[in-house]
Regions:
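Hydrophobic structural segments
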Residues: 42, 73-75, 94, 120, ...
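Short, acidic/small-residue loops that bind anionic groups at enzyme active sites
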Residues: 98-120, 127-134
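Short, well-ordered alpha-helical microsegments
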Residues: 28, 90-92, 117-118
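N-terminal glycine-rich "phosphate-gripper" loop used for MgATP/nucleotide binding
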Residues: 81-92, 111
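Metal-dependent catalytic neighborhoods of phosphoester/phosphodiester hydrolases
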Residues: 59-60, 93-98
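ATP/NTP phosphate-donor binding region
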Residues: 1-78
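Short acidic, glycine/serine/threonine-rich loops at helix termini
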Residues: 94-95, 120-123, 140-143
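Conserved anion/nucleotide-ligand pocket segment
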Residues: 126-160
């Protein structure tokens, strides 16, 4: 069975991307800053969801705070992509009674615990990227970083 997918608009320098923390609380701010530096060096504008630095136990805020952050970024008409800050645990809890607002689709980028969010988008036919979260991006080899941006900016992937 083949699912028809809608691809969000390809990104370009000057686009606004949001940092969202849907899973574990941020623990390594240095790694996050390095990831942000990569996005900024490519000309992207960065916004931070309201609760991205919150902490509730091991999570990046309560379920409601994290859900509001996700909704804030998804609903912002100027936002072109959501950069998940890190994985861990807790994203699937946000999907209980969750409905994606019907807006122009945006890229959601992450892996690990974020996979549930990516699958929920796939179920409604929106493509996303199972790729580095913000706190792991700088530790990816250059070829991996290049492939991420080749896809997000041009929709092209060269064979490995």
């Amino acid at each position: 069975m083949s699912l028809p997918f809608v691809y969000p608009a390809w990104l370009k320098p000057g686009d606004l991307v949001y940092v969202v923390a849907t899973s574990g609380a941020l623990r390594n701010l240095e790694a996050m800053e390095k990831g942000l530096d990569i996005w900024r060096s490519r000309g992207y504008n960065i916004a931070f969801s309201q609760y991205y630095r919150s902490k509730w136990g091991y999570l990046a805020g309560t379920d409601e705070e994290r859900r509001q952050s996700l909704a804030q970024a998804w609903g912002d008409p100027d936002c072109r992509a959501l950069l998940c800050a890190r994985g861990g645990y807790g994203s699937s809890r946000l999907l209980e009674n969750w409905q994606w607002e019907k807006v122009a689709p945006k890229w959601v980028i992450g892996f690990s615990d974020v996979t549930g969010i990516l699958w929920s988008l796939a179920r409604i036919g929106i493509s996303s990227v199972h790729g580095p979260v913000l706190t792991t991006l700088a530790s990816e080899p250059p070829w991996s970083q290049r492939r991420l941006f080749d896809w997000l900016e041009k929709g092209q992937l060269e064979p490995i």
